[in-house]
């Protein structure tokens, strides 16, 4: 059985992790977002915002972690595996910062492809900032555009998840995947 790899993408505070947690509670296999853990590990070493202080180091760690998750999904015996963000997010955020990075980043993104990409657009009603999520809502709108550009650059079609309750958004995802069969 080929496992379908499905990425939920979007800027900060768009509801991705909430949906991943809801999908997990319904029995779906989900790969969690790892950027918060990388940030927390750096903070324990005295680096407040590794992404801002050394975006390339942060992004290398993130790319490696997401690549590991992607490869791990190949051994999962489930029809669907959901990812909280995908590999091209790394490139999108570096482009947002106008930061250079090795061509190998794009090579990895081209090599490991997802079957479906769902995008959650910025939604001011649910937007929150915290110690790891420092971007303003206006910055989230800009990041969203970089994400769209990055994924399209790698040949993806994006499926917009409409605003709604968590259950409505989950239903939309599951119904879309059922129609795609």
What are these language model-derived features?
Residues 11:
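P-loop (Walker A) phosphate-binding loop of NTP-binding proteins
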Residues 98-164:
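A glycine- and Lys/Arg-enriched "phosphate-lid" helix/loop adjacent to the NTP-binding pocket
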């Amino acid at each position: 059985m080929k496992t379908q790899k499905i990425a939920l993408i979007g800027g900060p505070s768009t509801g991705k992790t909430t949906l991943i947690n809801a999908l997990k509670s319904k029995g779906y296999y989900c790969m969690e977002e790892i950027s918060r853990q990388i940030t927390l590990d750096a903070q324990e070493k005295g680096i407040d915002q590794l992404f801002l202080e050394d975006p390339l180091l942060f992004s290398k760690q993130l790319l490696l972690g997401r690549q590991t998750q992607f490869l791990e999904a190949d051994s999962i015996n489930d029809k669907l595996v959901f990812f909280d963000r995908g590999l091209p997010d790394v490139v999108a955020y570096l482009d947002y910062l106008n930061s250079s990075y090795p061509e190998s980043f794009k090579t990895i993104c081209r090599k490991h492809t997802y079957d479906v990409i769902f995008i959650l657009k910025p939604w001011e009603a649910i937007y929150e900032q915290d110690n790891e999520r420092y971007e303003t809502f206006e910055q989230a709108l800009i990041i969203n555009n970089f994400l769209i550009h990055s994924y399209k650059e790698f040949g993806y079609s994006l499926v917009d998840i409409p605003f709604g309750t968590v259950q409505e958004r989950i239903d939309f995802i599951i119904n879309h995947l059922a129609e795609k069969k």
